[in-house]
């Protein structure tokens, strides 16, 4: 941790009577520690400064970070705005649901949400579409004997999303290339010159948006077809509000972004946990054999409680979204502090996911906390998907594909008489921001 903080910046100071975490570097602030060791940074700040403190996010400025459980309520607060997200990442998230509030957010969300509910996913045949793609990929892993897990789950998620969108197989390499260039917008310096990440990222975004507009035109020309994109376009066109195609295209692009990176990380962590805890693998195999096939409908998921518990516990212990930025529109009372209007806020989901105030034995990976529960799932139990008006619209889609993946993995590997084994260390190379993921080099064997 010490090497990730600036040893020359030790001065204790206040902003609006709230302490600023020492150790920020010029230009990049606390980003090295936020990216590489966020859990320890949050614990150190809480221990030395209390529950409210400022972190320096470099180009995004200072965000007032609160580890008091009251901060979770900010996600539902009417005087807290998500518009700060667009200001931090305008090139990627401008005009999307995650950066909108109030009436604009409701209009856009209402126009497409039906396609993402269990009934909509079932009618569109999404489970039937995904199952053979997932089976083929895990069979390839079995045949190879070992894989570098995060790149593999990333490629699988891209294949699922492109299949969802109807991208022809021969076009997949081009889409892969443009998508990788699009991701450069996350970290691109604001220098727009030929050959630099900002120029390449913008060009890739424009190319992808042009393809998505063609998908929208095709969906309208073949309105009788089923599928998630067709259903999104149909629901969008039936909306009572006059909404532009720019909004529709931006949110289909958001589906591509959100559906790939975060889900691939969760999928990789699921395999890692199965590899390092043989009892989890045995329980999953037993369930998969009882079910006998990869589920394809949401109604089938209740037959897979172990796979669902694996999905939920992985999200809790290894949340792919660790921090959420917000802006206070009015003066707020947050715990024992008054927060001025206009304050930029950081809600540390990672901290709450592993808080002893919210979870029993939070550092233990335990499926029993889900399998033995009798009460319904609470908002705090799925905080990785957000809550209130901004709860993730893809929640049911992620739930379906990760349970499908778990069952397919167990059936395929058990039939071959093999199980996942961890071939490398886990802690080195982890990243926590802008999204969290395990090391890109972790290898999993099947033997």
From Swiss-Prot:
Keyword Iron assigned: yes
One MF annotation (Gene Ontology) recorded for this entry: heme binding
Disulfide bridge partners, by residue number: none
Gene3D superfamilies hit by this protein: Cytochrome P450
Required cofactor names: heme
InterPro entries: Cyt_P450 (IPR001128), Cyt_P450_CS (IPR017972), Cyt_P450_E_grp-IV (IPR002403), Cyt_P450_sf (IPR036396)
Protein name: Cytochrome P450 BJ-4 homolog
